[in-house]
Amino acid sequence: MSKKYFYPVIFEPEEVGVYVYVPDIPGCNTQGDSLEEALEMVQEVIGLMLEGKKPEEYPQASKPNEINLEGSQFVMMVAFDKLAYDKKYNAKAVKKTLSIPAWLNNLAIDNDINFSNLLQRALINELGLNAR
């Protein structure tokens, strides 16, 4: 179910830290004190820039060898995992209204069934996320 999207990211080492930007996603840039931090930050900012879009609306990734670089810039392909991003940044619980037969509701209540927990487990299983 989860798919990773790969984008070429331009890293530009500076006197202090590393500036990074994603040419395929307008306005998608950040920086870090180290290469590792910049890599972590760019994965987060890709998620922020794609927030609210469906995967089919994500920009097409350029080919890394077609990107023009200057000076000490270099390109790395960076993976964006929407499921991992959502688990980290969109874990807030939301209310859902559902309808079930009264007899089933009564039986579940009599057996101390936690509806929220049951629905979460059922959705995880139905979506094939139980192995992740």
Give the role of each language-model region:
Residues 1-6, 44-111, 117-132:
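Short, charged, surface-exposed hinge/linker loops at domain edges
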Residues 4-9, 27:
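Short small/polar-residue motifs
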Residues 10-23:
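Short aromatic-glycine-(Arg/Gly/Cys) micro-motifs in beta-strand/loop hairpins
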Residues 23-26, 101:
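Short, proline-centered helix/strand-breaking motifs
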Residues 26-35:
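A short, exposed loop/beta-hairpin motif centered on an aromatic-Gly-Thr core
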